[in-house]
Amino acid sequence: MFMGEYQHTLDDKSRLIIPAKFRNQLGDTFVVTRWMEHSLFAFPKDEWDKFEEKLNKLPFGAKDARAFRRFVLAGAIESDFDKQGRIIIPTVLKEHAQLNKNVVITGSGNGFEIWSKDNWEEYTAGTAENFDQIAEELTDFDL
């Protein structure tokens, strides 16, 4: 399970060091794609395959389903690590996530998210203010 929060920097060549704990869980190749709230999501290949299967079951007749599928699949890239444990973030993904030098990598269960530090701080501040209400709304999920 991917968990934790890590602060890293994106270098001038758009390379990002991934925490060693996450590299060990990802394997040799993995998928990075556009995600919600101007973030990116990295899936181990086996988790991506499961997710992609679910995407392929979305009804083509539903406009929102088509939009979600297009957005995620068009932004997806297969990636691997260099010898220093870095990945290259392509321009299209970098722009989507509004990444600059300061980046936050957050564990998210079956994968991890990549955020600009500014966006992450704004998101977590809002979530912290509403956390009790969010938790209450999730009682139906038996957490």
UniProtKB/Swiss-Prot annotation:
Superkingdom of this protein's organism: Bacteria
InterPro entries named in the record: MraZ (IPR003444), MraZ_C (IPR035644), MraZ_dom (IPR020603), MraZ_N (IPR035642), MraZ_sf (IPR038619), SpoVT-AbrB_dom (IPR007159), SpoVT-AbrB_sf (IPR037914)
Signal peptide: none
GO biological process: negative regulation of DNA-templated transcription initiation
GO terms assigned for molecular function: DNA-binding transcription factor activity; transcription cis-regulatory region binding
The SpoVT-AbrB domain, residue ranges: 5-47, 76-119
Keyword Nucleus: no
GO cellular component assignments: cytoplasm; nucleoid
Pfam family, one: MraZ
The entry's keywords: Cytoplasm, DNA-binding, Repeat, Transcription, Transcription regulation
Subcellular location: Cytoplasm, Nucleoid
Chief localization: cytoplasm
Family under the similarity heading: Belongs to the MraZ family.
Subunit: Forms oligomers.
Stated name of the protein: Transcriptional regulator MraZ
Species this chain originates from: Oenococcus oeni (strain ATCC BAA-331 / PSU-1)
Taxonomic lineage from the root: Bacteria, Bacillati, Bacillota, Bacilli, Lactobacillales
Gene name per UniProt: mraZ
